[in-house]
Structure formats: C-alpha cells, structure tokens
Amino acid sequence: MRSRRGLLIVLSGPSGVGKGTVRKELFSHEDTRFQYSISVTTRKPREGEVDGVDYFFKEREEFEEMIRNEKLLEWAEFVGNYYGTPIDYVEKTLQEGKDVFLEIEVQGAIQVKKAFPEGVFIFLAPPSLSELKNRIVGRGTETEDVIENRLTVAKEEIDMMDAYDYVVENDQVELACERIKAIVVGEHCRRERVAKYYKEMTEGL
C-alpha cells in the first residue's frame, strides 16, 4: 500500500560520507521509483560528473539571481560554493505521486525540513571519522587545508543529526541502500500519509 502523494526523501550527511555513491546505487535498483531532484551548485565539476545529470553547474552570478527570484527550495554556501534545490520541480513531481529524492548538504536539509516538515529526512553517517577522512583523501581532489576544513565541518554536522528522522550508517553501500528502501516503504504506509486518501474514498460511498 502506498500513499497517493509522493514523498520528499532527503538524504544528507557530511562531505565524503558517500551520499552520491549511495544515491547512484539506489537508482540502479529496478525496484526503486525515485525521481532525482538535481541540485544547482557553483562548484566546479569533478571528474566524471555531467551537467544536468549530477548537478546543474552555475556561475555565482546566476545562482544569486535564482536566490533573488525565490527559485530555490533551499540553498546554502558550503566551503566557498553555493548549493540549492529548484522548488517548482519538486512540488510538481510530488503532486504527480512520484517520490522526489534529494541528495544535499546538511545546511540545505535543515532548510528543507522547515519548508517541508512532512518529508523523510535521512542522515547518512560514516562508520568513523578516520574512515571519513580516508574517503575524502581518496578523492585526490582536495588540498590538506580543505580536508581538515571538511572534517571540522563534519564533526559539527554529526552533532546535528537530531534534526533527522533516521540515521543510516554507510558501512557498506549495498546495506545502506537496503536500509533506505525499507524506510521509504514504511513511510508510505504511515497512517497520517494515507488517511486523507481513504477519508475521501469513504465520503464518496
């Protein structure tokens, strides 16, 4: 049984925890029907990232115009770059009964929760801070100063997990995906999500 309006599913966590890897693995599963909401960012593309697939890559001036025109559900500045979520796309997709999947930074997730408290907020946690550092170093794209900055921010973000509905440890990507899928199935069956549909159905009898 599924609720008729789509769910807004927000996956968030520290930089380097593997949000992108988990999201790509989830979307490779045939039994998932998520609609990925592509974020807008001003950071430079990493190797293998494609504009319009992984992110919409914008210049700072373009992003700031979107802020002024209130075209973003949320936005945040993280390590010198902007990140944001286009609002019109999200609401339209939810109304169509599709689940919208957001993979965003922690600051952005907190903003989204204020605007969409009925969303499903999942904090992706690392097995340990040492493992998180290994993953960031393994990218080979960050300077030592940036790595240390990201770890400092990560500690602050882990302290913010109380704002989330669920915490999923990313010890193994496949296991993390199965946990997230189980969360979504359960959320679709929550009484408060399906009650309105059945109330309308019985009123028509």
Swiss-Prot record:
This protein's GO CC annotations = cytosol
Alphabetically sorted, this entry's keywords are:
ATP-binding, Cytoplasm, Kinase, Nucleotide-binding, Transferase
Indicate whether ATP-binding appears among the record's keywords. yes
Q: Which SMART domains match?
A: GuKc
Look up the domain of life of the source: Bacteria
Q: What Pfam families does the annotation carry?
A: Guanylate_kin
Q: Which InterPro entries is this protein grouped with?
A: GK/Ca_channel_bsu, Guanylate_kin-like_dom, Guanylate_kinase, Guanylate_kinase_CS, P-loop_NTPase
Q: Which PROSITE patterns match?
A: GUANYLATE_KINASE_1 (PS00856), GUANYLATE_KINASE_2 (PS50052)
Quote the EC number. Answer: 2.7.4.8
Domain annotation Guanylate kinase-like: ranges: 6-185
Give any GO molecular function from the UniProt entry: ATP binding
- UniProt keyword Kinase present: yes
| Catalytic activity from the UniProt record | GMP + ATP = GDP + ADP
Which enzyme class, named as a word? transferase
User: Subcellular localization, per the record?
Assistant: Cytoplasm
Residues annotated as binding ATP are G13, P14, S15, G16, V17, G18, K19, G20
The record's principal subcellular location, in a coarse class, is: cytoplasm
Q: Which family does it belong to?
A: Belongs to the guanylate kinase family.
Q: Which NCBIfam families match?
A: guanyl_kin
PANTHER family, per the entry: GUANYLATE KINASE (PTHR23117:SF13), GUANYLATE KINASE-RELATED (PTHR23117)
Protein function: Essential for recycling GMP and indirectly, cGMP.
Q: What is this protein called?
A: Guanylate kinase
Q: What is the species listed in this Swiss-Prot or TrEMBL entry?
A: Bacillus anthracis
